[in-house]
Amino acid sequence: MLRNTFFRNTSRRFLATVKQPSIGRYTGKPNPSTGKYTVSFIEGDGIGPEISKSVKKIFSAANVPIEWESCDVSPIFVNGLTTIPDPAVQSITKNLVALKGPLATPIGKGHRSLNLTLRKTFGLFANVRPAKSIEGFKTTYENVDLVLIRENTEGEYSGIEHIVCPGVVQSIKLITRDASERVIRYAFEYARAIGRPRVIVVHKSTIQRLADGLFVNVAKELSKEYPDLTLETELIDNSVLKVVTNPSAYTDAVSVCPNLYGDILSDLNSGLSAGSLGLTPSANIGHKISIFEAVHGSAPDIAGQDKANPTALLLSSVMMLNHMGLTNHADQIQNAVLSTIASGPENRTGDLAGTATTSSFTEAVIKRL
């Protein structure tokens, strides 16, 4: 009885999108001969192959109708810039969806973030970061339930910077109406889909009057198309103060913000909800293509030691399954993962003050499917 109650309470916990937002919907079809969907899998670097193996084992045990297509995004140089290899681009473009482990950006002149390169290549304009407390895993804050949507393609991450003269560097924050409208409209649609009545635009237009001012003004214009939702605006510094003092004030809202603010706030939210990025899923949404990823790093210091926590990638795969409409399989895996974590330190990895290995955690999840 207790187990069933836990399952009901955690159902569709991280990405409640049984009703899909009207933007960025998955349109892929299963293979007629196998009845399975093909998903590109970027295993990543460092601990990536280990946590990817965990996902594959659990999906196999759960009989999820998915065939994995391995995808190598090791960067190549074209005209001096980091580029994704053509086979990887073709795979993801064909399959419309990918699951991605952590990537390490090579060190050296000309290399830019591989995550940024993927977002640019596939037009992944919205980064969806849910953060919610896990029942049975005690952290400083309880009952955290936050959803943040980050603009994913421009802002301070546009890569436009140069040396003006020795000792002076200029970095450009690029904000455009098109990109702002894209992500804000998605935030409205997402809020409507998951039943949250408020959309909060986080900004600093008191200082960045033109850049953030444009972002806020676009939101105000779009809000007229969503009379059933309430638009609020909030200064970034005030938002940080409020969320750490009273995160429950945001349980009925979806926050949306420009790129840099979203990068910082999303990790803050993860700290409030779980105390670890090892539990945090993420979705990168484009109009046609979406990539789901663990947001933590590649952790080369523990790679190959059977110590890595696969939870973030597993919960990202749950987000992916919901996105694809495979909600029963999503619920099955999600509930198994969360009940495993709640069962005690013997089934938690070291980053959660537990004693489990990657392998033993994986087997514990499979037993709970």
From Swiss-Prot:
EC number: 1.1.1.41
GO biological process: glutamate biosynthetic process; isocitrate metabolic process; tricarboxylic acid cycle
Binding site for Mg(2+): D237, D263, D267
Pfam families: Iso_dh (PF00180)
Cofactor: how bound: Binds 1 Mg(2+) or Mn(2+) ion per subunit.
PTM sites of type Phosphothreonine: T105, T153, T327, T349
Domain of life: Eukaryota
Keyword Oxidoreductase annotated: yes
Activity regulation summary: Allosterically regulated by several compounds including AMP, NAD(+), and citrate.
Stretch forming the signal peptide: none
Keywords: Allosteric enzyme, Magnesium, Manganese, Metal-binding, Mitochondrion, NAD, Oxidoreductase, Phosphoprotein, RNA-binding, Transit peptide, Tricarboxylic acid cycle
Catalysed reactions, semicolon-separated: D-threo-isocitrate + NAD(+) = 2-oxoglutarate + CO2 + NADH
Amino acids binding substrate: R119, R129, R150, D237
Record-level Gene Ontology MF annotations: isocitrate dehydrogenase (NAD+) activity; magnesium ion binding; NAD binding; RNA binding
InterPro entries: IsoCit/isopropylmalate_DH_CS, Isocitrate_DH_NAD, IsoPropMal-DH-like_dom
Subcellular location field: Mitochondrion matrix
Record-stated family: Belongs to the isocitrate and isopropylmalate dehydrogenases family.
Name of the molecule in the record: Isocitrate dehydrogenase [NAD] subunit 2, mitochondrial
